[in-house]
Regions:
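Solvent-exposed interaction patches of small proteins and small membrane subunits
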Residues: 1-113
């Protein structure tokens, strides 16, 4: 694996762990998530950063692993967050944080081990 891809996967994993820690800290409650701007923005920023990092993975790595990880969707989430102009769908972000981020973390752990 390319050294830069390796480093980016480490950073992606750290952002996944950050999202998990925010959920533990603030609670796994959707109403708290949508009403606490610090919680919401912390998760959104991590998801945004994950998308940025995914975008900078080499095309070869993304192609090789696309059956295991939907890189285009991850990159699309970054674009959606960047260009939604205050119209971020909290439910989509919540589902991403609770369902997709743990899978991405496990993928990173597997590839990095």
């Amino acid at each position: 694996m390319d050294k830069l891809d390796w480093q980016k996967l480490i950073h992606i994993k750290v952002h996944c762990e950050d999202v998990e820690s925010f959920i533990k800290r603030f609670g796994c409650d959707y109403d708290v998530f949508v009403n606490d701007r610090a919680y919401f923005n912390a998760v959104a920023m991590c998801v945004f950063q994950i998308g940025e990092l995914a975008n900078s993975l080499t095309p070869e790595f993304r192609e090789k692993t696309k059956k295991d990880m939907p890189w285009d969707m991850i990159r699309g989430m970054r674009n959606w967050l960047a260009h939604s102009y205050g119209e971020v769908d909290a439910e989509v972000l919540w589902e991403t944080a609770n369902n997709d981020i743990p899978k991405l973390k496990e993928f990173c752990i597997k590839v990095l081990s």
